[in-house]
Amino acid sequence: QADNPYMEVLFDKMQLRTFTYNFTFSPKNRQETEDVQKIIQLFRFHMSPELKGKNNRFLTLPSEFDIHYMYQAQDGQASENDYYNKIATCVCTGCDVNYTPDGVKSFEGGAPTKITMSLAFQETELLTKERVAEGF
């Protein structure tokens, strides 16, 4: 019996990458509060499936998201930031909202003075060497 001089590694599987983004909203008036509510509702809507078919027996897939890191160039145009890795098409897997991050504080009428939102995304494709070479 001879010793094997080569290292062996058991490759099991790749994991899909996940990304989390945290936002803090501090609306100053009623219009800004309504805008924040629309943003939250938009993400909650697009992360959810839809019932379809006769007797609502089937679920459709949730919306997909293409996330890009952008910056404003000196000429005022938005440009993609190449210093960050690209992100493949994602689905939103979580939308956590806290309406009382600093305790219960509200404007007249009950609207919260501060809201935090955490969004979780997961890519829909596995990362390969070819995709890494493309900047992912």
PLM regions: where:
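Acidic, Ser/Thr- and Gly-enriched intrinsically disordered low-complexity segments
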Residues: 1-136
